[in-house]
A protein has these predicted regions:
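Trp/Phe/Arg-rich N-terminal binding region typifying the photolyase-homology
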Residues: 1-196, 208-213, 217, 224, ...
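Glycine/tryptophan-enriched, flexible segments
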Residues: 169-213, 244-380, 384-389, 522-525
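Active-site-proximal binding-pocket segments
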Residues: 320-518
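Glycine-rich FAD pyrophosphate-binding loop
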Residues: 555-580
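Central helical "cap/lid" subdomain
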Residues: 571, 580, 585, 681-737
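A conserved short coil-to-beta-strand element within the FAD-binding core of flavoproteins
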Residues: 658-673
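Active-site substrate-recognition segment that forms the wall
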Residues: 722-775, 781, 785-794
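Flavin (FAD/FMN) cofactor-binding core of flavoprotein oxidoreductases
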Residues: 791-798, 814-850
Length: 887
């Protein structure tokens, strides 16, 4: 056992045995407070890390500061995880204030970023935090320790048998159960002690820092008497002390390097929490869960209800999700909002009482204290737990031996995430993860095993297992999650013979067998049952990329969504015009780029599906100075076989009413009513998402304040000519940006990936100024003039040695020969709302009171990526409104 420093002498044994020394240093003379970094034990009751920090602050005669931060950069950061953590933090910091303990919360977002934890650690006399063995905490802790000025202690707050006492990782539950039996029994029989304020002195005032230790002296403050282990547990985590606690020092007393959240202000603003989450640069397409709010109160309410009515039957009902036989505590345990120590004690009391509840309590404790803590201990000692290296050698070998076996099917990441495999049981399970943020453990085992058979190799299966679980599950990224996922690929298990296809000797759990004991239709009905009785109705006006992303995100999240589109097709300016089978033109958006990591992830999935491809085209700039290669080229992508493919893809499975123009969106007491151009109502909806160009949005909204904001964002028109030639235009490039020309851009459409190269098809985009000056030209005349300008550009290119004459030529209106072959097709299309020189850079507009969202590329920097991000942001606003309960 690691010896603790003298400053922690007298720390009660139930706490002391949990402390791990991360960095052993002398206490710095300049340290002005003890810092408790709180992250995965969001509770005041039975919190060994908080108790250790309070004890140490008392010993050092220094104030205690509790710091909690929420980063935008943790893996799978999204509204769901952010909301759950913030809800729990709001309650915890309220209880800390009631206990007289100063606490601050830093929420990373634009204007509020920086390495503030490391800054505080560098000024603290000591740092105390929770010992949590999975990323990102396990990665961040060494960095914090490196920057800390004083010692750093990590305290196990998650396990009844502390991880550090187990000594090693176990790969079988029975081995772990036997090895820890004595330690577990001793701790279950020992009530948790009470941290009384008469024994842990109140926090010292900031100005009373007279006994701060120096670098060369030990702490001389006498230890407070330890609380006897047999002391009765606190009757209530928030019971008032015998004397009012002193007022905590203001946050300004700690010279904070950031502005902490003002919880009182957030409480006063009904939409404050949702707005803060919306400001964060995280995934807004995974929304909060309305019936699973964060916080100790909600967690213990769930536990008490289960203890009363479910615990006794747990052994019999736990494997059937239709019986609601589980505690559903995993998310609360994952973030330490409930104490596993208390849960275990109370379950053990039921078991000890005997009678009908004994079997259920005994099985529950086995899951809580053996399987769960087996996973925590495994992750603690196996730092490779997040990789396939953590899988037993026999499992790795047998899966490798069967890697070439024929798979029943292969699915891409998007189809899996959306639950679109065609297997009713698996799709219902994935929908439970996506919509409810949880998955019944017995179903999770079958769900996870299926991915082994649906992916080409172990590495891909593991990646999908981790991504799907951690993105959607509220209990994701914790040791229990890794334990369950590792079990799916052979860990904590033994070989099964004879070998099976794909799996080898890894245990199988066929979906068809599970469907015989769990009716997929009943399970899907349970998963889809709205928490409020009926699914919220959402109207999306506009089936461009922004509208489709918003609509599909909400439909996948359980909303009843109707899309209204004035055109016959979907996709907006991501459009493709076909003149005949071999002639196709992307006459709207030409290509797209991907800078945002979440959009980039979607693009990689589209590439995997064959829906998109990289376009490494040779591009040039043509102007008065000549022709120059475009050197500052980002990676460009196109949709396949045309840009309109994305509209068809996103529109699949959506209810779209096409060729229908909405004239007005009118506010009603219960939401919004849509009126078409014939004056007919198209229905009333709880939410409205307007996803059309800014001038059209302004017309739809009447006197709503957003109408003025939309009207302030102009959109420019664009003439687009489409030309096909009898022979190839002789250029060394496939696309060009033009300057001082009627044209802004030209591209060889037939050179894009997935296009028919047998015909030479070009798209010619006019400048906004030329289009505005020639807005009323007949389209045939606009096409002829733009073709002439193209010929002039090709002539410039030829003169610069970049290709040129192609044989036959045609005459321009001024009689000059143009170096172009004869056209076999020439047409034009006028885009009235093509682009905007000014965007609001707001992602979307949201009116919380009326439940109205505006989205579109005109709000988010333009282009397809901007439209995607704006649609996702609008969906996030609706998801947060529906998923965040009023405090």
């Amino acid at each position: 056992m690691v010896e603790l420093p003298e400053s922690l002498a007298g720390l009660p044994e139930p706490v002391a045995e949990r402390v791990r020394v991360v960095a052993s240093r002398r206490y710095p003379a300049a340290g002005t407070f003890v810092l408790h970094w709180m992250h995965t034990a969001l509770r005041v009751e039975e919190n060994p890390a908080l108790d250790t920090a309070r004890f140490l602050a008392t010993r050092l005669n220094l104030p205690l500061l509790v710091y909690q931060g929420l980063s935008e950069r943790y893996p799978y950061a999204c509204d769901r995880h952010h909301a759950f953590i913030l809800q729990g933090a709001r309650e915890t910091h309220r209880e800390l204030a009631a206990a007289g303990i100063p606490s601050v919360f830093h929420l990373e977002r634009p204007g509020h970023r920086g390495p503030h934890l490391r800054t505080l650690a560098g000024r603290a006399a000591a740092v105390v935090t929770e010992d949590f063995p999975t990323a990102p905490i396990s990665d961040w802790l060494p960095r914090v320790a490196e920057r800390a000025a004083g010692p750093v202690f990590a305290v196990d707050t998650a396990c009844v048998v502390p991880m550090r006492l187990v000594g090693r990782a176990y790969d079988r539950a029975f081995s772990y159960r036997d090895a820890t039996a004595a330690m577990r029994a001793a701790r279950l029989a020992r009530p948790w002690f009470t941290v009384a304020r008469t024994q842990f002195a109140s926090v010292a005032p900031v100005v009373a820092n007279t006994a701060a230790p120096t670098a060369s002296t030990s702490v001389s403050t006498p230890a407070p008497p330890p609380v006897p282990p047999s002391a009765p547990p606190s009757a209530s985590p928030s019971a008032p002390p015998s004397a009012p606690p002193p007022a905590p020092p203001p946050s300004t007393a700690f010279d904070l390097p950031f502005e902490p959240l003002d919880w009182e202000r957030i409480e006063e603003d009904r939409a404050g929490l949702a707005r803060l989450i919306g400001d964060c640069d995280i995934d807004h397409t995974v929304g909060p869960i309305a019936d699973t709010p964060g916080g100790s109160r909600a967690g213990y309410e769930r536990w008490n209800a289960f203890r009363r009515s479910g615990l006794a039957r747990y052994a019999y009902d736990r494997n059937d999700p239709l019986r609601a036989g589980t505690s559903r505590l995993s998310a609360y345990l994952r973030y330490g909002m409930v104490s596993p120590l208390r849960i275990a004690r109370e379950a053990a009391a039921v078991m000890a009482a005997g009678g009908g509840g004994k079997a259920g309590a005994e099985k529950f404790l086995d899951e809580l204290l053996v399987w769960r803590e087996l996973a925590y201990t495994f992750c603690h000692y196996r730092r490779d737990h997040g990789t396939v290296a953590a899988i037993p050698g026999w499992a790795q070998r047998t899966l490798a031996d069967h890697q070439a076996d024929r798979r029943p099917a292969l699915f891409d990441a998007e189809s899996l995430a959306r639950g679109c495999t065609g297997d009713p049981l698996w799709d219902a399970a994935q929908r439970s993860l996506r919509v409810r943020g949880e998955l019944h453990n017995n179903v999770r085992m079958t769900w996870g095993k299926a991915l082994v058979g649906w992916t080409p190799d172990l590495a891909t299966a593991w990646r999908h297992l981790v991504d799907l679980n951690h993105q959607f599950a509220l209990d994701g990224r914790d040791p229990s999650s890794y334990g369950g996922l590792l079990w799916c690929v052979g860990q904590f298990d033994r070989p099964f013979t004879p070998p099976q296809p794909v799996f080898g000797t890894v245990r199988t759990r066929p979906l068809k067998d599970h469907a015989m004991r769990l009716d997929p239709d009943q399970y899907r009905e349970q998963v889809d049952r709205p928490a409020g009785g009926s699914a919220p109705r959402v109207a999306v006006i506009g089936a461009g990329v922004a509208g489709l992303i918003a609509a599909r995100t909400l439909a996948d999240s359980g909303f009843e969504v109707s899309v209204f589109e004035k055109s016959r097709g979907a996709g907006g300016r991501a459009a493709t015009r076909r003149a005949e089978p071999k002639l196709a033109f992307d006459h709207g958006a030409q290509y797209f780029t991907a800078y945002d990591p979440r959009f980039r992830q979607a693009v990689e999935t589209w590439i995997e599906q064959g829906l998109a491809a990289r376009w490494p085209a040779p591009l040039v700039q043509i102007g008065p100075a000549g022709v120059a290669a475009k050197t500052d080229q980002p990676e460009r992508f196109v949709f396949v076989p045309g840009m309109s493919a994305i509209g068809r893809h996103l529109a699949k499975d959506l209810s779209i009413r096409g060729d229908l123009r909405i004239a007005r969106v009118e506010s009603r007491p219960a939401g919004w009513e849509l009126i078409d151009t014939a004056g007919q109502s198209q229905g009333q909806f709880d939410y409205a998402v307007v996803a059309v160009p800014s001038p059209q949005a302004a017309d739809l909204l009447g006197d709503h304040p957003f109408a003025a904001e939309a009207r302030a964002v102009p959109m420019t028109p664009c003439w687009a000519a489409m030309a096909a030639f009898e022979r190839r235009v002789d250029t060394a490039w496939d696309g060009a940006f033009l300057h001082e020309s009627p044209l802004a851009w030209v591209s060889r459409n037939s050179a894009k990936p997935g296009r028919d190269p047998s015909s030479d098809c070009w798209v010619l985009h006019a400048t906004a100024d030329w289009t505005a000056a020639n807005l009323d030209l007949p389209k045939d005349e606009a096409a002829r003039q733009l073709l002439a300008a193209f010929g002039h550009s090709v002539e410039q290119s030829a003169a610069a040695g970049q290709g040129g004459r192609c044989g036959a030529s045609h005459s321009t209106p001024d009689g000059q020969a143009a170096p172009l072959p004869a056209t076999i097709h020439l047409d034009a299309h006028r885009w009235m709302f093509s682009a905007t020189p000014l965007t609001l850079d707001r992602q979307c507009l949201w009116d919380d009171a009326s439940q109205l969202a505006l989205c579109g590329d005109w709000l988010a920097g333009g282009r397809i990526e901007g439209a995607y991000r704006s649609g996702a942001a609008a969906a996030g606003c609706v998801l947060r409104k529906a998923g965040l309960a009023t405090p």
